[in-house]
Each structure stands twice: as structure tokens, then as C-alpha cells.
Amino acid sequence: MEGTRLGFEIVGDISNIETVAVGSSIREIARLRRQYGPGRWRKLKGIAMVRLPDATLCRAEVHWYESHGMGMCEIKVKRLLEE
């Protein structure tokens, strides 16, 4: 999975996945529905290894939106984690 246009790439799987919000609890729900279409939108977070633009590998907390049939959208690195 790549997020290179965002300046990072996810390497491997995302672990410790948790749901942050669902449906109308998502602050950006109107924009998501307008931009990507209707669906059961969820905001999730998890831990992943990411490759930064300088080729450094590190663990990071990542957040993203997901809808059935749509997959992952707008993946963001929220913070880098200490090893």
C-alpha cells in the first residue's frame, strides 16, 4: 500500500486497528460522502511501519477513513512512535 503522494509509504500490515468514529460521528462525513460517495464510513487508527521521504523506516500511528466497497482513503501519519 502506498501513500507516496503524501510523502510516506506503509510497509507491511497495520496492527492494533481501532475504530475512532462511525457515520455521523465523523467530523468530515459530509465531505467524504460528497467526494467519494455514500456508504458506511468509519474513521480508524492503527500502528504501521512507514518509510519516510528520506528512506527512514519507523513505527507510526496512522489514521484513515474507510467505507465498504471503497477501501482505505486519506491515510495520514499522526505521530511517529519511539522504538
Pin down the residues of each PLM region.
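Cysteine-centric segments in proteins
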Residues: 1-83
